Each structure stands twice: as structure tokens, then as C-alpha cells.
Amino acid sequence: MRNSFFPAIGVFSLASALICSASSSWETDWNKALEKAGKGGHPVLADFTGSDWCPGCIYLRKNIFDTDAFAKYAADHQFVLLELDFPKAAGKMPPEQLKFHEELMRRYGVSSFPSVLLMEGNGAPYAKIVGATRTPEEYLKKLEAAGETRRKLKETVAAAQPLKGKEKLEQLVKALNVLPEDLQPFQKGLIAEISALDPEDRYGFAKK
């Protein structure tokens, strides 16, 4: 496991002080985070981190996630923040929880720290951000790009619903192709719809 790191702030107000509570409101329970996101239709920001040994992870938390700028953005966009930690210090995390985090790491193909997955409440990711940035503003630009992917995916799927047959199939394929190829297999429902309209698997999505 390698760690990704781009090495190297804010106007303080009562509002930002209140928003900054987001920095201490990270969930650490996978199921609770997804349940909360699912109920509210909110996106999940899942941070795969080595909080006590990974320099890039420590930098990302201190210089990006614990800033007013990020806290405001996370609150405005109603993120459910989820920390999936891989500590090395003995006794910092129950072995069964660490084992579950390792299972999630394999499931989502996480190969470096820090890695952030943006996903829906059903666990389907729509974007991945690997490493840190020098400033919060640079990181927020990455989150904006991820949010645009999410919006485009939802809009393209919605546009397919009134269609039928080949037209619907092509629109659903277009929707799936909004995502990076490595994240497409997690869209189980969308792939099932495509497969039902494409029994000969001409588009090859049944194999995903």
C-alpha cells in the first residue's frame, strides 16, 4: 500500500464556526453512514485513510478537511462524511472493524492512501479522488467535478425513463458511460436495466 501526497487559512465568523462542527461529525460506521445518506438522498464522502502513519492522510485531514472552506462546502452539499481508518497503533481499532475496512478496500479497488470515494447511499461510487491537494480550494474543485458527474448521471438516467426499446437502451448506456470505467460495475441497477434491453449483450455490460 502506497500513500499519495501533494505537500504544501480562512475568514472566521460565527457562521463558519458553526459550520466547522462538520469537521468533528465524521461517521466511522459504514452501515450508519450509508443508511443516513440513503434516507436523505445525500452523497457520501468516504475517506480511506491511515490517520496515524500516512503523511498524505494527515495533511489531507489537517489542511483540507479541518478547514472552514471544506466544512462549509460539505454542509452546503449535505455530504455524509465517513472515515474508514487503517491505523497502525495497537488497540486503536477493534480487529473486526479493521478487517471490515480491509474488505471494503478490496471491494472498491483502493490501492493508495489517502483515497476518497464519493458515493450514493446504496454504496455505488460515482467519483474517486486519490491524494491531497495543496489548498482547500484546489480540493473543492475536484469535489465540484465529482458533483457534476453525479448530476450528469442522474439527468441522463432520468432522460431514459420515458423512452422505449433501442432508444432507451442507448440512453442508459450513455448514462453508464458518464462514469469512469472502473466505477461502472457498481451500478448494478443500471446494468440490470441495460441487460434486460440488450439480451445479446452487444454492449458488453452484462459481464461487468
Regions found by a protein language model. Give the residues of each.
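Loop/turn elements at helix/coil->beta-strand transitions in domains of secreted/extracellular proteins
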Residues: 40-44, 77-82, 111-114, 121-124
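Non-catalytic, surface beta->alpha helical segment in thiol-disulfide oxidoreductase systems
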Residues: 63-65, 103-151
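Non-globular targeting/processing and membrane-anchoring segments
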Residues: 141-208
